[in-house]
Amino acid sequence: ATKLAIGYTLDEIENDITKSTPASFEPALDYVVVKVPRFAFEKFPEADTRLTTTMKSVGEAMAIGRSFPEALQKALRSLEKVGASFKWRTENLAELLEKIGIPTEFRLQQVQSALFNGASVDEVYKITRIDPWFLEQIRLINDQASLIANSGELTKELLKSAKMMGFSDAQIAELRKTNEAEVRQIRSNLNLHPVYKTVDTCAGEFAALTPYYYSA
């Protein structure tokens, strides 16, 4: 910014990440960053839990993934709060549709549950006005959850697709009605392990010199 202020042009400034391309080089991103606010209403029992234009969060969690569903699920788990991660349980749809009309701390989870329990994307959009693109991404997560729960066995392809959608071993175990250690052992036997990707601005086209990585 300082160099630009004194007259440098973008093509004269070095990209700090690659050290080999100019700042004018069009960035290409192969990752998604999701930030989720963290609330602490349990510490303030008399506070109004409805979300308004007033800031009520006490912090946030950030996650990086290769896709929006992966980054979203990782961010929710990073809140380290009971009820933050998605669950796939049978609930009363009418009650859920009533709840999602009021923006609260757990509205996102209620929207996910409503979609899982039979609500359509259009129906949820009319109540919440959440952009259908985001609702469709949540629906895809639910579809993957159903596939995990109802498949005969955990194949390498199924586990790989589940991980690409951001499912943890614990979530897969809950859907399969087994334990986390067993899922981890199956995954290990199938040679499926986390890898670490570099955060850069060129989608791996050039070597990045910044020590900034995320697991995927």
Per-region residue spans from a language model:
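ATP-dependent carboxylate/acyl-activation modules
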Residues: 1-216
